[in-house]
Amino acid sequence: MEYEFRRNSLTGTYLASFSMDHEVLGQWFSEELGPELAKIQQVLDIIKDIQAGKRDSWRLIGGDLTLDLDEEQARIYANALGFEQEYELEESMSLYDAESEAYCGLEDLEEALLSWYKFVEKGR
């Protein structure tokens, strides 16, 4: 999983871009976490708790995206995917694509979060 972080020098906006099949992580980092160091640290602390066996799983529901963590992986998905559909969507209208949902290993997410934390902290 590859990623790149940028900061718009005019607006001060922090942006994260992730490799194919993980694009939604970039949106989650940029929009749901943003430059809030306390929120980033909260997720890092939860990951440590899960790795230490203090928790089995954890969920953070954001404005547009949700993060689910368990002992093995992280899942980030659009909140719209969490609702059951009463009818079948046409294949071309499917919500399940790389821009709506992604999985990665817990350690991979932890590494990316640490990098994001350092990037944001450095830019202040």
UniProtKB/Swiss-Prot annotation:
Species, as recorded: Shewanella sp. (strain MR-7)
Entries under InterPro entries matching the protein: UPF0231 (IPR008249)
Family: Belongs to the UPF0231 family.
Transmembrane segments: none
Stated name of the protein: UPF0231 protein Shewmr7_3366
Organism ancestry: Bacteria, Pseudomonadati, Pseudomonadota, Gammaproteobacteria, Alteromonadales
Domain of life the protein comes from: Bacteria
